[in-house]
Amino acid sequence: MKNLNCFIFIYLVVPLLGRAQSTFKIEWKSWSELEQSIKEEPKPVFIFFHAKWCSYCKKIEREIFTKSEVIAKLNSKYYAVEMDVEETDTITFEGRKLTNKQALTKRNGVHEIPLLLASRERFPFSLPATIILTKDFTLKKRSFEYYTSKQLLDFLK
């Protein structure tokens, strides 16, 4: 009987637990949602810039942004925004229209928003780029490398 109960638990309950965890995700916001949310309840902002061709970005999305402690921290303490740097849509934020002007002249052109927030003097634009802004949109921290979940949690302190 013990073996039967164990069998039932393993084959019926454990898969359900896995499915329940997979629905616990980072609550990513669009730029317009961010603008509205900040007005209603000011919080710091976590921004993750990525591209389809960036292997370290994909690894962060797959291995770090799926960790429950990372998800819980981001969802409770920050507004999270993720953006493909090659986005071609015009984004209106705080009354300013921002576009990907490079898309007209360059392959893999970068949108104005990541260029404004993640460019560095004397360094080429690089990914992954992670930005923390205060609730007043002042730059607090930036990271331009792959990180583990522990490193990200330390970065978020």
What are these regions (language model features)?
Residues 1-23:
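Bacterial Sec-dependent N-terminal signal peptides
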